[in-house]
Structure formats: structure tokens, C-alpha cells
């Protein structure tokens, strides 16, 4: 079944006559299909008007994979008990989004617990759409749709002068007369058909209307052309739309504008009904300053998010980003988006409408996150010194253990609100994929933001900040204490061993009451190596140190003029280093040091960097002795100790039923690579090939194509297509690079590509 609805103010050519008409008429039923959730709401509004009740937009549900809306409820206005006029009415419909993009009515309750009023006028002034539907038997339907004349924002009283972008004179919107002498509706009252010169004008118009009516505005969803990627429509919504924050309550009020062929914009959908109390005359500063800060306007900007959290703190937040940065960066973002359709950027607004933090990531960074986003560093090295640019980066580590950029940001201020917005935006750009572990500073705002946005992610404190605190708080302590302190941190193999050594240390030097030592001990699971080994931090050194992605190329002396060029140069340099390692891993063959089949197996699969680490562990395993200390059924335990060093020993547990092995050193849990102790036990048990579970795909030569093995993990079809596009583009880039190194390679590459093209054409 398909239901078609027309844009507001338009009438279908069949005027709502059903195809294969049936006696169901306008009665909703399970299986009814719509193109969009808005069409489902308009349809239910029409049914409600005929039946005698009003509709509110109810709860929505989001995908756990990517955060997109997966289903919506539209309820009787008397649902719930929050207001005296409500009676807890159970009537509702629920529509669910299918993989095709259609919305299907899957739940319904028609019974009301109150009297119905017969045919009533809709509370909103939006014209009702005509409806076409397919049903089993013949009946004719017709809905009268009032027509309203179109009206331009620019009034004839201004003698045809166009309204400048981002500037509106509301004196020109007072009930003008059209050529027939009929008074048009006031432009301060939005309606379908209202025209604007730009998206900026529409935004400021709706914001001014919101001030009069008494609500705040957020810039909502946008839609892009499949042809050229340009923005074709935008939604402006009530600030209480959605449920992502306690201040929001799923309000359905919005205005949508659509771009015309002429370049202008027209209101094509509208809902004026709110599900909350309004405050007429309420100042709505949320959007006023956007065109001052971002001169490029809304016609092309991707996402501008008003941070609701700022409503609960001081209305003014300091901003360390110079105002001149916004237009320059926006121009850069738009130029990047023209050449890279996967380029993502977002700008945060505070409660006064001022531009705050900025986030961006290109398609390669977004694709890299799908492969190497399991362990992430939020690098705020700019906080170490007097940096003029508050530039932060999200860093992952690839299959060569090289840092890869997963997104960049300018941080307006160091508040919980700023970091929460930044983490949420990064998560949105990365299709909702949360990291297993994250290295970030220990300041309270960052701790709170990580806990809020990344529940279940192991937050590890930045090593540079721990070192800085140690220098500050331990400088007056004797060298003997510092030596034992370092030994306690880096030589304790288990959490029990660390706790014992720490207790002995503070007692020995009479530091039981030292406030700083007590504080960091209470947070030991976030920075002590023994407490971190059970979590995966692939590529990050055990002491937590790492080299900043941009090194010293971006520093306290970097000016606005130099920032973008240095950013691009640093990014290209890192990616060139990755390409070189890819080439070496595929074309260079490291020497084998043993005759063990596991060494040949791992040489074939791992990248050069990872294989060398494995090869070192395998070689070291010959310096250890293994002794079975316990056996019951399929479970065995081994004590593995180093020859000539009784103190260096570890316990390995092995299950013969599934070849599972675990070691007390927890190297596999932390790095994703088998340790020398397990390799020793495998050698004793004559296991000549590593089980596949111990060769993580992220460390192999083909790691960049890992998503192909993960198609059924809940990734949406849209995200999967984006991943495939990004992956093929990257593969094509490397293919071109290799194929153009000589004329012979070019001929071979061209022939391979042509043959591959033939296979693709015949593939069904």
C-alpha cells in the first residue's frame, strides 16, 4: 500500500481519489505506507479532523547504530495527564521506517476515552494535503485544500528592492495587497507558499515569528541533491523538538523551506502546533547572530546546533576563537565539500546565538574511524602552552600503528557543554560508533562529557597531564621516593601487586594524608598501567605517551592565514606516510627468524610493523620455560618464567576445547597481539597455527576493507554505501599511484581495470 500526499497548498490532480479504492476510506490501518513521517502526521491530522479530535506529535525512537529516527508516534492531544485538559487518552498511531526509506503504520489504537467533537477545524493554519491510497474495494475520497496566494518577503512598498541576505525589515511585512487588491496574510504569520531570497531570510523570519508567539528556534535537518550534493531543503524547528535533552519534549512545530530553480526558497511544509506552553514576547536570540559570524549564510552550511545545555548555565560563555575564523573556515569547508561529498562539519551556537565550537572531518577520516576508531585519543595539546588556536584533534591508530586523523575541532571554551557538544557531534559524524577506549585529559568538564556521551568507554587520562601534575606535586620529594614511585607504576604486573606496592610506599614515607596522592590513587583505574591492561588501547604505548598528529607544525605562533595550509600539509604528509607503509607491506618480504609455521602465517597476514612486533615476541618466547601447574578436564594452567630470572613469571590458562588462552600479562587484551608467554605454551602444546580469533583484522594488510566482513553488524544501508564509496575511492587512489609509476605498470593496470569492469557489468 502506498499513500501519497502533496506539498502544503497544492492539490493532486486526482484530488484525493484512491487507486483501487476500497471501503476503508480515510480509516488508518496497519500496513499503510507513507513516503515520510511528515506525510504520516499530515494524514493522521486529516483523519483526526474528520473524526473530531486533535493530534500531537508523540515519542520518537532512534536507531542504536547511527542515532537516526526509526519510528514515531502521533497521539491524541488528550494523551497523558500533564495538563488539566488531558485525560490520558490511549489513541495513537505509530509509523516505522523501513530499509527502503518508506514509513509504515505498524501500531494503532483507535479508541478514545473522551467524547469526540465530530468534524472540527484544524488548529494549525496549514492547509491539509490531499491523500491518495490503495485499498481493496471502491470508494471515493476528497479533501478540500484551501489555496493561498504566494507572497514574497520583499514587499512592493519597497519599490522592488531585494532584501539583503541575513537582513529583514519587518515593517515591510504588514499585510500587503496583491495585484487583485486582496490583502495577503501578514508575512509574520508563516504559511505554505511564502517565498524568500535566501535560507538566511527564512531563518530570521521564523525566528522573529517565534519571538512573537513565544518559543525558541533550532536549525534542523537538511536534504541534499543526489546530483550535485547542494542543499535542496531545510527545516527550522522548535527548540523543544526531539528528546536528546531533558529540556526537549518532542514538539512537532516546524517550518520547512525548499530551494526553487530560480535560487529562491519557498515554505512547502509547516506545522504550527506545539505540545508545550508558549511565552509570547520571549526573546529568541538563538539565531540572530549567525549571519554576523558566518557570512556565507545557511544556503550551504551543513549543521548549526544550538546547545540546549547552555540554557542551564550562565547565558554568556567565553569564546577563545576569534570571530574572524568563522567565515574563513566556512569558505574552506564549502570548498572541501564541493570536492568531497563525505565531508562533514558543524558549528555550535550558544544561547545568545553566537558561534562557538567548530567540528569537521573529511570522508577519509570518517572511513578511517570505521576501521580504527576502537581506541581514540582526544588530543588537546594546545592547552599545554599559550596557543592562539584552540585546535583539538580526534586521533586513532591504523594497522601500521601510525596516528590517523578522525576529525578536527576548534574548542570555544573548556566547559562541559562545549566538550559534550563536540563529542556528540563527532559521534554523529562517525555514524554512532563509540570507541572502546579513549585517552583524554582529566579535567572535570572532560571527564563529565566523556561519561555522558561515551558510556561504557574506558576513559584514560592523558600522560602529559599526569606528568605535569607529578612534576608539580612531587618536586620536593627525595629522589629515592621518585624511584620507588616509578617502580610501583611500571613494574607492578597486576592490580593487587600495584595496590600492595602503593600502600607500602605511602606508609614508608609517611604520605598517607597527602591530598594529591590520595586523589590520584582513587582514580587509579584511569591512569595506572596495571589497571588499563584489561582494556584495548591498540597502538598507544603502555605509559600513555603519543606524538601529536601535527607535531610542531601547528603551534602558538600559527596565524589564521597559515592555519589551513599547515593543516592540509600536515594531513597530506601523514597520509603519504601511510601510503608508503601500505606499499612496503605489500611489496617487501621480511626475513623469517624461525622455522615455526606461525611465523610464516603472520608474515603473510600482518603489516610489516605489526609482524615485527609479533616476530620479537616469538623470538623472546625461546628464552622462557613453561611448566604445567594444573589440569582439570579441558582446562590447563601453566607457569611461564624467564630463564635466569625467577621474578619474571606469568600464568597462562588454556582451554583445549576451543583453544582459548589468556595470560596474566594481558598483552592481547591491551594491544591485540599475542604475548611471548602464550606463544611459549602454544609451542609446548604443538599448536603450529594461530586460531583466527588471535589475529585481529585491524592489524592485517587488508584492514582498510574490514567493513566488508561486518555487513550484518547493524550498519544501515546508507552508512554501508558511504563506507563502500570511501573505501573504493581510497583503493582507486592507491591503484592510480601504483599504476602510473611506469608505462608498463600503466598498461597492466589499465588491462586489469578493463577486465574487472567487464565482470562488474555481468555481475547480478
UniProtKB/Swiss-Prot annotation:
Function comment: Putative transcription activator involved in regulating light control of development.
Domain MULE: 375-471
Pfam families, per the entry: FAR1, MULE, SWIM
Family named by the database record: Belongs to the FHY3/FAR1 family.
GO molecular-function term, one example from the UniProt record: zinc ion binding
UniProt keyword annotations, A-Z: Metal-binding, Nucleus, Repeat, Zinc, Zinc-finger
Domain FAR1: 42-118, 204-280
Localization in the cell: Nucleus
Organism domain of life: Eukaryota
Coiled coil: none
GO process terms (BP): regulation of DNA-templated transcription
Ranges of biased composition (kind: Polar residues): 123-133
Induction conditions: Up-regulated in hypocotyls by far-red light treatment.
The keyword Metal-binding belongs to this UniProt entry's keyword annotation: yes
Tissues expressing the protein: Expressed in hypocotyls, rosette and cauline leaves, inflorescences stems, flowers and siliques.
InterPro entries in the cross-refs: FAR1_DNA_bnd_dom, FHY3/FAR1, MULE_transposase_dom, Znf_PMZ, Znf_SWIM
GO cellular component: nucleus
Protein name: Protein FAR1-RELATED SEQUENCE 7
Keyword Transmembrane helix assigned: no
Amino acid at each position: 500500500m502506498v499513500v501519497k500526499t502533496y506539498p502544503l497548498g497544492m492539490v493532486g490532480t486526482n484530488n484525493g481519489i484512491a487507486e483501487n479504492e476500497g471501503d476503508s476510506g480515510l480509516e488508518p490501518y496497519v500496513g499503510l505506507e507513507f513516503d515520510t513521517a511528515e506525510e504520516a502526521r499530515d494524514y493522521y491530522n486529516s483523519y483526526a479532523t474528520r473524526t473530531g479530535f486533535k493530534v500531537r506529535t508523540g515519542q520518537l525512537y532512534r536507531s542504536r547504530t547511527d542515532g537516526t529516527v526509526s519510528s514515531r508516534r502521533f497521539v491524541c492531544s488528550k494523551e497523558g495527564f500533564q495538563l488539566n485538559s488531558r485525560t490520558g487518552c490511549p489513541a495513537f498511531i505509530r509509523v516505522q521506517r523501513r530499509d527502503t526509506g518508506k514509513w509504515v503504520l505498524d501500531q494503532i489504537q483507535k479508541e478514545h476515552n473522551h467524547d469526540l467533537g465530530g468534524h472540527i477545524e484544524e488548529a494549525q493554519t496549514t492547509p491539509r494535503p490531499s491523500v491518495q491510497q490503495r485499498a481493496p474495494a471502491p470508494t471515493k475520497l476528497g479533501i478540500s485544500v484551501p489555496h493561498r496566494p504566494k507572497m514574497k518577503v520583499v514587499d512592493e512598498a519597497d519599490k522592488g528592492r531585494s532584501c539583503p541576505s541575513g537582513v529583514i525589515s519587518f515593517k515591510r511585512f504588514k499585510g500587503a495587497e496583491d495585484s487583485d487588491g486582496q490583502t495577503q496574510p501578514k508575512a509574520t504569520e508563516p504559511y505554505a507558499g511564502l517565498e524568500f531570497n535566501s535560507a538566511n531570510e527564512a531563518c530570521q523570519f521564523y525566528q522573529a515569528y517565534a519571538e512573537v508567539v513565544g518559543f525558541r528556534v533550532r536549525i534542523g535537518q537538511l536534504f541534499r541533491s543526489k546530483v550535485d550534493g547542494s542543499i535542496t531543503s531545510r527545516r527550522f524547528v522548535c527548540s523543544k523538538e526531539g528528546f536528546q535533552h531533558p529540556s526537549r519534549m518532542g514538539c512537532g512545530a516546524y517550518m520547512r523551506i525548499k530551494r526553487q530553480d530560480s535560487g529562491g526558497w519557498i515554505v512547502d511544509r509547516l506545522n504550527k502546533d506545539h505540545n508545550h506552553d508558549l511565552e509570547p514576547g520571549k526573546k529568541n536570540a538563538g539565531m540572530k547572530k549567525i549571519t554576523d559570524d558566518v557570512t556565507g549564510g545557511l544556503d550551504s552550511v551543513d549543521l548549526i546546533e544550538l546547545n540546549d545545555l547552555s540554557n542551564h548555565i550562565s547565558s554568556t560563555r567565553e569564546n577563545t576563537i576569534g570571530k574572524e575564523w568563522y567565515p574563513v573556515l566556512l569558505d574552506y569547508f564549502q570548498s572541501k565539500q564541493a570536492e568531497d561529498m563525505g565531508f562533514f562539519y558543524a558549528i555550535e551556537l550558544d544561547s545568545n546565538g553566537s558561534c562557538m565550537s567548530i567540528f569537521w572531518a573529511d570522508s577519509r577520516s570518517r572511513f578511517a574511524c570505521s576501521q580504527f576508531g576502537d581506541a581514540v585519543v582526544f588530543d588537546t595539546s594546545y592547552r599545554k602552552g599559550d596557543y592562539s588556536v584552540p585546535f583539538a584533534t580526534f586521533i586513532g591508530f591504523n594497522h601500521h600503528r601510525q596516528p590517523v586523523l578522525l576529525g578536527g575541532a576548534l574548542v570555544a571554551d573548556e566547559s562541559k557543554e562545549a566538550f559534550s557538544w563536540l563529542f556528540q557531534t563527532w559521534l554523529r559524524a562517525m555514524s554512532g560508533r563509540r570507541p572502546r577506549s579513549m585517552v583524554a585529559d582529566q579535567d572535570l568538564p572532560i571527564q563529565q562529557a566523556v561519561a555522558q556521551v561515551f558510556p561504557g568507554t574506558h576513559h584514560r587520562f592523558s600522560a602529559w597531564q599526569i606528568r605535569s601534575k607529578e612534576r608539580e606535586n612531587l618536586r620536593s620529594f627525595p629522589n629515592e621516593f621518585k624511584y620507588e614511585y616509578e617502580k610501583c607504576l611500571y613494574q607492578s604486573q597486576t592490580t593487587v601487586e600495584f595496590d600492595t606496592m602503593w600502600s607500602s610506599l605511602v606508609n614508608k614515607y609517611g604520605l598517607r594524608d597527602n591530598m594529591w596522592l590520595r586523589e590520584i590513587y582513587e582514580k587509579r583505574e584511569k591512569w595506572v598501567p596495571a589497571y588499563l591492561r584489561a582494556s584495548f588501547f591498540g597502538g598507544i604505548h603502555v605509559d600513555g605517551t603519543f606524538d601529536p598528529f601535527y607535531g610542531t607544525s601547528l603551534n602558538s605562533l600559527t596565524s589564521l592565514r597559515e592555519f589551513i595550509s599547515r593543516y592540509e600539509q600536515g594531513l597530506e604528509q601523514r597520509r603519504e606516510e601511510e601510503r608508503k607503509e601500505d606499499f612496503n607491506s605489500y611489496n617487501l618480504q621480511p626475513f623469517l627468524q624461525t622455522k615455526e609455521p606461525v611465523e610464516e602465517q603472520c608474515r603473510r597476514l600482518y603489516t610489516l610493523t605489526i609482524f615485527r612486533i609479533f616476530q620479537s615476541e616469538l623470538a623472546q618466547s625461546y628464552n622462557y620455560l613453561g611448566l604445567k601447574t594444573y589440569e582439570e578436564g579441558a582446562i590447563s594452567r601453566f607457569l611461564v618464567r624467564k630463564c635466569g630470572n625467577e621474578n619474571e613469571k606469568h600464568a597462562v590458562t588454556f582451554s583445549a576445547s576451543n583453544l582459548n588462552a589468556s595470560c596474566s600479562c594481558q598483552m592481547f587484551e591491551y594491544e591485540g597481539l599475542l604475548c611471548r608467554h602464550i606463544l611459549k605454551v602454544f609451542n609446548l602444546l604443538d599448536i603450529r597455527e594461530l586460531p583466527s580469533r588471535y589475529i585481529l583484522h585491524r592489524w592485517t594488510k587488508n584492514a582498510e576493507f574490514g567493513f566488508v566482513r561486518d555487513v550484518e553488524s547493524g550498519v544501515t544501508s546508507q552508512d554501508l554505501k558511504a563506507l563502500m564509496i570511501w573505501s573504493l575511492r581510497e583503493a582507486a587512489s592507491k591503484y592510480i599511484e601504483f599504476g602510473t609509476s611506469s608505462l608498463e605498470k600503466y598498461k597492466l593496470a589499465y588491462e586489469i581495470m578493463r577486465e574487472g569492469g567487464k565482470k562488474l557489468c555481468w555481475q547480478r
